[in-house]
Curated annotation (Swiss-Prot):
One of its GO terms (biological process) is plant-type primary cell wall biogenesis. Residues 299-300, 886-890, 948-977, 1031-1039 are extracellular. Probable catalytic subunit of cellulose synthase terminal complexes ('rosettes'), required for beta-1,4-glucan microfibril crystallization, a major mechanism of the cell wall formation. Its EC number is 2.4.1.12. Binds 2 Zn(2+) ions per subunit. The lineage of its organism: Eukaryota, Viridiplantae, Streptophyta, Embryophyta, Tracheophyta. It is a multi-pass membrane protein. It is an enzyme of class 2 (transferase). It comes from Oryza sativa subsp. japonica (Rice). This is Probable cellulose synthase A catalytic subunit 8 [UDP-forming]. The gene is CESA8. GO terms for molecular function: cellulose synthase (UDP-forming) activity; cellulose synthase activity; zinc ion binding. It catalyses: [(1->4)-beta-D-glucosyl](n) + UDP-alpha-D-glucose = [(1->4)-beta-D-glucosyl](n+1) + UDP + H(+). Mn(2+) binds at K538, D562.
Length: 1081
């Protein structure tokens, strides 16, 4: 450490550093310090190269691509004259001012770190350490400085958890763990003896700099792109450049590793611009239409008119909240080859970040073990370094069936994983792979593939039989409870009162596959449950997995999957890493969300289960603002973001009016520039949005510290108050790049893991309020994502060509409505909570249109009330003979026609840029009405009962069972529920209204047919939207199509009423009145 300090000091006041562009000395500033062009990565660039790049180049650092800030003494360039810049504050992030000693030290450390990494391949900008360089710091001797908080960074994952054989079932506490000793902390000591090696960077860029320097010295000298001032004749790409002693091919490869790992792909202007124009036109037409409706009441039907106008105003507001977050849709591309070049070169240890994958399950009767097993198998076979993947299965029902099924799965994985990796098959869930109706021999050239596939299919069928046997055995619970293989009672016999359980099935020492290769870790977790403790359902289970994984493996990133969502694209994790590990983008990304795709849905998607309008339109629109909302599964998280920390704060630049709509913030005035960085950070965040910054902890370590052990203890207590009473877990939160300390033993880690899943661990901590999955709603996903966005994080929407994950969806009408009811109930709970996006987090860093989207996500169930009224109005109008619209003139009819045209045009152009089919769009419109007048309506009243009266509703797990009685047998199964009553009632009264309206028109003559057409159109609009519901209500019709039955009943009713009206058997004779004329008339 002392040697490092001396090296830094000598480097700060020396000028021996070479510019990595031209080879000249970097030089010093006016104060005598080493000139640092980029304060983010410390890439050595001399002053002339820096000035050229700002004036004529890309204005960004060649290594990290961060835009250069103007240094003291540098002339302003075009675009900077009107900006509120500070030449002294050259950082793009809130570091201390450049003149301070802390900043100088940070710059020197960054430049020294770059020296150690230059020329070493991937992981640019991150310090690398030899395995023997990890040791305790000098503070171990007892010298504890003031403000010192022990922290660990960049630790390698070690202290592997041994896998257990099937006879070692679990580890559960046999008694009180007792007083836990302080967890050993380690720190890194970089090796200062590593040789400095430069990098040529971009060759063409270097040549432009050389020409610019000559032009500055000798006047204007013409240059041509790609031509050096002093070219070497006959030199090819593979020749040696004498000025740098570097091979050109290596230089080009090195330049490739510096390229971004992903990029935004804006939509073509020919598609997005007409779409935006139609939105604006529709807004104008809608305003004129509402003005006309308000100023032209219907005198003889005033109540009906008033109700309709209120509903139409609400629909307009709802449309605005839904439409404008789709103003900036984008696509994204990833470069997996660049990711491999930078972090996963062949023949070298992989530098990819570790990922902990969470699978959650509750009830094995509703979530079949075979479905969960397929999900786990697809995870274990993912295309990612095995030592970087850990799979944690949360069994919140403490079912022995789930435990035994995982034991069987771990054994079958030893055969399945090498098979799929050998032949590179997709998908890697065996159930779905073997059920594919495709040519499985396509692109397969290995002579033994057919034989191996046949043998593997037989192995899988035997595996299915064993799982089915476990399920059959579990149907009848013994009176004395379940007994394990060793004769001891199963600890989870009482699902509401049992200890925490952890079992490691696979891992470093948990056995190898059939080819002798290591398998990813597979860990079974069942958190402790006791009566009288609030367990917070799925959110509580996910937070328990976060803590267990942090103690055992501490992957830098986490993937959350439902038990029925398997990995369909084995490169899904690499796709996510293209964003999360990108040096420019990754540091501000809280999660990468993938779209949900589904198997087993009927061809017509009767109940809009695919939900492509939401996943392919709405979320792509949000990706252009601050990122998509978290949808509960298929999401890769940055662990730091889940811990409640804030992202690095970027100083906002002045932008256009449209960028301000997206949330751009004005810069602080010059008079406030001299305030501290902490005050600047706090300006962005409301008091209701607590923010914890890792930089604050680092400053506490570096600054004036504590004088005694009592002050150090107070600092540790503040962290334990936030994260809980676990020294091991608190230490893991300070490891920026994940990993567990090498000195930790598997036994101590397992004991600590049992402790962090105890039912009382979260008491008096910030779990569920500021850290982890947020409590307070059954849709914890929306709330969790909203909290992270409010802190300033952004999310990414990744849509690879091959869907990353696939799952199952309820195709039965009743199950689908119950699923929608749960989602809507969660939104209502958020709406009436303190986290309501209408008022929560103002003054923070949530962008304006992103807030629009969250408001729409929570307020949409309320639309069910005006929608229900609007669906009843047609029948009332037909039965009473009145209408909600007065007689309109030809001029007024133009606005009605224009409104309908703009509605259809918006939909058509939306489908055009998104690729969503018209059938999918129409199914979404239909189910919006079906769900609105049933599930959403019930959710509003249940939410009000919960908030006002404290009456809680039970959370029901959506069944994931597959069809066993034929294809889509569940689609036609009739399951009665109270959710079916409102749509059924509306259907009947509208059909009766149609019959009554036609009869009335016949009775009144041809003069009544004109007003009738408007009423009939109104009624048929409701009936057509409810047609899928009507089909589901009638079930399977083996002989007569449903549409025939409906029209038969409708036409029979009309003709019956006509028959009664005409009464053809009654003789009607026209003549004089017999009473007047008498008998002789």
């Amino acid at each position: 450490m002392d040697g490092d300090a001396d090296a830094v000091k000598s480097g700060r006041h020396g000028s021996g550093q070479a510019c990595q562009i031209c080879g000249d000395g970097v030089g010093t500033t006016a104060e005598g310090d080493v000139f640092a062009a980029c304060d983010v990565c410390g890439f050595p660039v001399c002053r002339p190269c820096y000035e050229y790049e700002r004036k004529d180049g890309t204005q960004a650092c060649p290594q990290c691509k961060t835009k250069y800030k103007r240094h003291k003494g540098s002339p302003a360039i075009r675009g900077e004259e009107g900006e509120d810049t500070d030449a002294d504050d050259v950082s793009d992030y809130n570091y201390p001012a450049s003149g301070s000693a802390d900043q100088k030290q940070k710059i020197a450390d960054r430049m020294r770190s770059w020296r150690m990494n230059a020329g070493g391949g991937g992981d640019v900008g991150r310090p690398k350490y030899d395995s023997g360089e990890i040791g305790l710091t000098k503070y171990d001797s007892g010298e504890i400085p003031r403000g010192y908080i022990p922290s660990v960074t960049n630790s390698q994952i070690s202290g592997e958890i041994p896998g257990a054989s099937p006879d070692h079932h679990m580890m559960s506490p046999t008694g009180n763990i007792g007083k836990r000793a302080p967890f050993p902390y380690v720190n890194h000591s970089p090796n200062p003896s590593r040789e400095f090696s430069g990098s040529i960077g971009n060759v063409a860029w270097k040549e432009r700099v050389d020409g610019w320097k000559l032009k500055q010295d000798k006047g204007a000298i013409p240059m041509t792109n790609g031509t050096s001032i002093a070219p070497s004749e006959g030199r090819g790409v593979g020749d040696i450049d004498a000025s740098t002693d570097y091979n050109m091919e290596d230089a080009l490869l090195n330049d490739e590793t510096r390229q971004p790992l992903s990029r935004k792909v804006p939509l073509p202007s020919s598609r997005i611009n007409p779409y935006r124009m139609v939105i604006v036109l529709r807004l104008v037409v809608l305003s004129i239409f509402l003005h006309y409706r308000i100023t032209n009441p219907v005198r003889n039907a005033y109540p009906l008119w008033l109700l309709s106008v209120i509903c139409e105003i609400w629909f307009a507001l709802s449309w605005i909240l839904d439409q404008f977050p789709k103003w900036f849709p984008i696509n994204r591309e990833t470069y997996l080859d660049r990711l491999a070049l930078r972090y996963d070169r062949e023949g070298e240890p992989s530098q990819l970040a570790a990922v902990d994958i969470f699978v959650s399950t509750v009830d094995p009767m509703k979530e079949p073990p075979l479905v969960t097993a397929n999900t786990v198998l697809s995870i274990l076979a993912v295309d990612y370094p095995v030592d970087k993947v850990s799979c944690y299965v949360s069994d919140d029902g403490a079912a022995m069936l789930t435990f035994d099924a995982l034991a069987e799965t771990s054994e079958f994985a030893r055969k399945w994983v090498p098979f799929v990796k050998k032949y590179n098959i997709e998908p890697r869930a065996p159930e779905w792979y073997f059920s594919q109706k495709i040519d499985y021999l396509k692109d397969k050239v290995h002579p033994s593939f057919v034989k191996d596939r046949r043998a593997m299919k037989r192995e899988y069928e035997e595996f299915k039989v064993r799982i089915n046997g476990l399920v059959a055995k579990a149907q009848k619970v013994p009176e004395e409870g379940w007994i394990m293989q060793d004769g001891t009672p199963w600890p989870g016999n009482n699902t509401r009162d049992h200890p925490g359980m952890i079992q490691v099935f696979l891992g470093h020492s948990g056995g190898l596959d059939t080819e002798g290769n290591e398998l990813p870790r597979l860990v079974y977790v069942s958190r402790e449950k006791r009566p009288g403790f609030q367990h917070h359902k799925k959110a509580g289970a996910m937070n328990a997995l976060v803590r267990v994984s942090a103690v055992l493996t501490n992957g830098q990133y986490m993937l959350n999957l439902d038990c029925d969502h398997y990995i369909n694209n084995s490169k899904a994790l690499r796709e996510a890493m293209c964003f999360l590990m990108d040096p420019n983008l990754g540091r501000s990304v809280c999660y990468v969300q993938f779209p949900q795709r589904f198997d087993g849905i009927d061809r017509n998607d009767r109940y809009a289960n695919r939900n492509t309008v939401f996943f392919d339109i709405n979320l792509r629109g949000l990706d252009g603002i601050q990122g998509p909302v978290y949808v509960g599964t298929g999401c890769v998280f940055n662990r730091t973001a889940l811990y409640g920390y804030e992202p690095p704060i970027k100083q906002k630049k002045k932008g256009s009016f449209l960028s301000s709509l997206c949330g751009g913030r004005k810069k602080a005035s010059k008079s406030k520039k001299k305030s501290s960085d902490k005050k600047k950070s706090n300006k962005h965040v409301d008091s209701a949005v607590p923010v914890f910054n890792l930089e604050d902890i680092e400053e506490g370590v570096e600054g004036a510290g504590f004088d005694d052990e009592k002050s150090l203890l107070m600092s540790q207590m503040s962290l334990e108050k936030r994260f809980g009473q676990s020294a091991a877990f608190v230490a893991s939160t300070l490891m920026e790049y994940g990993g567990v300390p090498q000195s930790a033993t598997p036994e101590s880690l397992l004991k600590e893991a049992i402790h962090v899943i105890s039912c009382g661990y979260e008491d008096k901590t910030e779990w569920g309020t500021e850290i982890g999955w947020i409590y307070g709603s059954v849709t914890e996903d929306i709330l969790t994502g909203f909290k992270m966005h409010a802190r300033g994080w952004r999310s990414i929407y990744c849509m690879p060509k091959r869907p990353a994950f696939k799952g199952s969806a309820p195709i039965n009408l009743s199950d689908r409505l119950n699923q929608v009811l749960r989602w809507a109930l969660g939104s209502v709970e958020i709406l009436f909570s303190r986290h309501c996006p209408i008022w929560y987090g103002y003054g923070g860093r949530l962008k304006f249109l992103e807030r629009f989207a969250y408001i729409n996500t929570t307020i949409y169930p309320l639309t069910s009330i005006p929608l229900l009224i609007y669906c009843v109005l047609p029948a009332i109008c037909l039965l009473t003979g009145k209408f909600i619209i007065p007689e309109i003139s030809n001029f007024a009819s133009i606005w009605f026609i224009s409104l309908f045209i703009s509605i259809f045009a918006t939909g058509i152009l939306e489908m055009r840029w998104s690729g969503v089919g018209i059938d999918e769009w129409w199914r979404n419109e239909q189910f919006w009405v079906i769900g609105g007048i049933s599930a959403h309506l019930f959710a509003v009243f249940q939410g009000l009962l919960k908030v006002l009266a404290g009456i809680d509703t039970n959370f029901t797990v959506t069944s994931k069972a597959s069809d066993e009685d034929g294809d889509f047998a569940e689609l036609y199964m009739f399951k009665w529920t109270t959710l079916l009553i409102p749509p059924t009632t509306i259907l009947i009264i509208n059909l009766v209204g149609v019959v009554a309206g036609i009869s009335y028109a016949i009775n009144s003559g041809y003069q009544s047919w004109g007003p009738l057409f408007g009423k009939l159109f109104f009624a048929f609009w409701v009936i057509v939207h409810l047609y899928p519901f009507l089909k589901g209500l009638m079930g399977r019709q083996n002989r007569t199509p449903t549409i025939v039955v409906v029209w038969a009943i409708l036409l029979a009713s009309i003709f019956s009423l006509l028959w009664v009206r005409i009464d053809p058997f009654t003789t009607r004779v026209t003549g004089p009145d017999t009473q007047t004329c008498g008998i002789n008339c």
